[in-house]
A protein has these predicted regions:
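Cytosolic, long alpha-helical scaffolding segments
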Residues: 1-182
Length: 182
């Protein structure tokens, strides 16, 4: 419960950092008038910081749900176990996306994009497990919906990691989704 509270409090700090980074980027744009790769970096950084802020929001939402789940789901619960594994995958995607962005590593970014299929697969598998659970015992609907919310947030975290990875191509080439931007 304390860890969950810490995550929720941390979201406020993430929001503050987002504003600070955006302010710094705008200051650079206005004062330095960057061109080419510098402009691409600043533009991509502003996009990435938005994704990171949203990931923080999702983490805070998960942290608010998890303490309740601990009271209604049993240890070894298959849906919870699979959700934990899904969370590990989404977390690794985020770490790898941030590393790929920092290193401007297109191959690493591509690996992040490819990894999203596994997170999406887990989401759909767990969703089906929960639907079957509710069909078998409608009294479990509230606990199942809490797990469903958690896995949806995890799936969105994976999507934001993909967004971050997609900005690597832009950093290197000025292309985003294979379209020349500048």
């Amino acid at each position: 419960a304390e860890e969950a509270k810490g995550i929720v409090k941390g979201d406020t700090e993430v929001n503050r950092m987002e504003r600070d980074i955006e302010h710094r980027c705008m200051t650079l744009l206005l004062r330095q008038q960057p061109v080419a790769s510098d402009l691409r970096f600043i533009s991509a950084a502003m996009k990435v910081v938005t994704d990171v802020e949203r990931i923080g929001d999702h983490a805070a939402d998960i942290a608010e749900i998890v303490p309740h789940l601990a009271g209604v789901r049993k240890a070894g619960d298959p849906a919870v176990s699979r959700s934990i594994e899904m969370g590990r995958k989404a977390h690794k995607m985020l770490q790898d996306a941030m590393s790929a962005f920092a290193a401007e590593d297109e191959a690493a970014a591509k690996s992040v994009i490819d990894a999203d299929d596994a997170v999406d697969y887990d989401f759909n598998t767990i969703k089906r497990m929960l639907a079957a659970e509710i069909a078998a015992d409608p009294s479990k609907v509230d606990a199942a919906l809490d797990v469903l919310m958690v896995i949806k947030y995890l799936e969105r975290i994976g999507d934001h990691a993909v967004n971050i990875a997609e900005w690597v191509e832009f950093l290197r080439t000025g292309r985003y989704h294979h379209e020349k931007m500048f």
